[in-house]
Amino acid sequence: MTGQAEVLAALDAVRDPELDEPVTALGFVSSCTVSDGGTDVQVRLRLPTYFCAPNFAFLMVADAYDAVSAVHGVERTEVLLDDHFASDAINHGVAARAGFEVSFEGEAAGELDTLRRDFVRKAVLAGTDRVCRPLVAGGATPDRLAAMTLGDAPPTPDRERLRERRSELGLPAGDDAPLLVDLTTGGAVGVEALPLHLRRARLTNVNTEANSSVCRGMLQHRYDTRGQGEVEEVR
């Protein structure tokens, strides 16, 4: 029988598109209710502000609906976004499986797919910094970094997260793939281009971490309860 733990585990795969972190860890899941028989699930989501971008919000609600619906034994799924200026449109659109363009008239077709890919690209850059910065601190030279493969990097959660994000973009992600790849061509980043690539990766990661900290702080200020599955920020 499906329980809350299984549903929250499924929601761990749903990410804030901008922050590239699970909605559970961020505290965005305010409640998760499973019926006695395990067939009906209701999830309520919350966000740091009333005016969070509706396209971001729609992505998270729709992804949460898909994740919960895919849990074995679940027959009826309801995912609701609370306390947001576009809650009604988002909740109705997701429940009707209408899509963002139908729910928000006038938005460009395919906008969400483009937005998602843009943020995954940023996640790849941020992940590159998290994997490469310890290597640089340990004395790895530009020549060494340019010659390394993904499998040469230490087997850390950050490396596997980077591998997953690269796979989502169709970029080389096997152990024999270059550690540093061009996001457009998928080819290896050469020694000459490496400093600029690493600077871009570092800037992207710093911005992402700063945004994550701000969002967590705003959420805590807005709500005085912890979310289901929330993980305390590591500083």
Residue ranges of each PLM-predicted region?
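Domain-level signature for proteins that mediate thiol-based redox and metal-cofactor handling
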Residues: 1-50, 55-235
